Amino acid sequence: MQVIETLAEGLKREIKVVIPAKDMEDKMNERLADVKDKIRINGFRPGKVPAAHLKKVYGKSIMAELVNEIVREQPTAILSSRGEKSATQPEIAMTEDKDEADKILSAQQDFEFTLSYEVLPPIELKSVKGIKVTREVIDISDDEVTEQVLKVAESARSYESKTGKAANGDRVAMDYVGKVDGEAFEGGTDQGAELVIGSGRFIPGFEDQLVGVKAGEEKTITVTFPADYPAKNLAGKEATFDITVKDVAAPGAVEINDELASKLGIESADRLKEIVRGQIESQYGSLTRQKLKRQILDQLDEMYKFETPASLVDAEYNGIWSQVNNDLAQSGKTFEDEDTTEEKAREEYKTLAERRVRLGLVLSEIGEKAGVEVTEDEMQRAIYDQLRQYPGQEKQILEFFRSQPGAAASIRAPIFEEKVIDHLLTEIDVTDKKVTKEELLAEDEGEAKAETKKAAPKKKAAAKTEAAEAGEGEEAAAPKKKAAPKKKAADESAE
């Protein structure tokens, strides 16, 4: 077998592979010899079929098997022998001419194919001893825990029907039909909708006009949709809602006690507070971790400058760009609304994609050298978390992970990345700094603005290697404002 490099330009490589017809024929004859005793052909005793006849009957099919095996197995072996790692699966090209293909399968012509790929750049790891980061630490007060428990209690609050007029804080159950210019609009109708007056769930002015209504009353209220309302066909327009009040209910008292905990399936009020405190700690911990990680990535980005494989950058960029456009479509906005142009946005996201890929390669190299591995238990837990997000679709999701190799990689990559960050935190200089809740949140908002209003895409581009998937924990840029999340058709129209 001859392996000839025909292109070496930057990270791009092209390899021509030639396997002489004689070698292919020898391999075919070996296969025929192995199976001759098992083949049954009418008119011949087992094992007595002449080699020439076997070759005539089965030669081409065996040669086709050999060709498939070679193009499946040899690229990996060739790259390994060259000491190279491809950024993506190598592209394989071979003749498409029917006559030439027939000659190859008949061992009358050498078998040739071409590998085209990009190599992962060699990365010489640098010392991380000079990296210094600040880990913000926040003390959670009892008052904050109580405040959050009260919010939980509000959600579990009971209501009791009353005969009087609705007041602020009362819950109103109603049917309604929304109209613009006298015509009912899509999503503007609901039956049995419940709304707590003063909750701010519906658009401005809607809830205020429910104050004073009674059960059984019919009323038409008039509101104006905000100018920046996500649904462009409603934004800034006056609308009427014909309402039939079904019930008015007064709120019960909100108390933090064992009875409340019992309603929530928790053994006691103290245990409820423990759970809430744990949730707050987790939320602040995630924010602190995110900011800590950003500091590490920023400094690694300054330390490493090298050419990145275009194929990986394109895949990452396409994923970001797709999400950005989805966000714009959902919000009904344009790039001009975000004080930019499509051209400038493309440049920014291309730069972000390059940074992500570069840092992904660096993190992958650091992790490999440090012996970081993702265990089977960690993978199973991550997949289980995915299953919990889609109840009723467990079977389809499991089948997806089994049938799509890239799906497992997309689960493994973020776990691998976080474990590399954990490793780095043991190697770098970390200083703890106590901050208040306001400082923690205010700084994060400031950083978000400084980073051109970045927001994480919901899905990453499917990467072809773990190095690329290990990508980056930072967030991809997105529009400043998103459309309000859609709830029920009724809520959506009146929010």
From Swiss-Prot:
One of its GO terms (cellular component) is cytoplasm. It catalyses: [protein]-peptidylproline (omega=180) = [protein]-peptidylproline (omega=0). Its EC number is 5.2.1.8. The lineage of its organism: Bacteria, Pseudomonadati, Pseudomonadota, Alphaproteobacteria, Hyphomicrobiales. It is found in: Cytoplasm. Consists of 3 domains; the N-terminus binds the ribosome, the middle domain has PPIase activity, while the C-terminus has intrinsic chaperone activity on its own. Transmembrane segments: none annotated. Belongs to the FKBP-type PPIase family. Tig subfamily. Residues 169-254 form the PPIase FKBP-type domain. This is Trigger factor. Pfam families: FKBP_C, Trigger_C, Trigger_N. It comes from Rhizobium etli (strain CIAT 652). One of its GO terms (molecular function) is ribosome binding. Residues 441-495 are annotated as: Disordered. Keywords: Cell cycle, Cell division, Chaperone, Cytoplasm, Isomerase, Rotamase. One of its GO terms (biological process) is cell division. Involved in protein export. Acts as a chaperone by maintaining the newly synthesized protein in an open conformation. Functions as a peptidyl-prolyl cis-trans isomerase. The gene is tig.
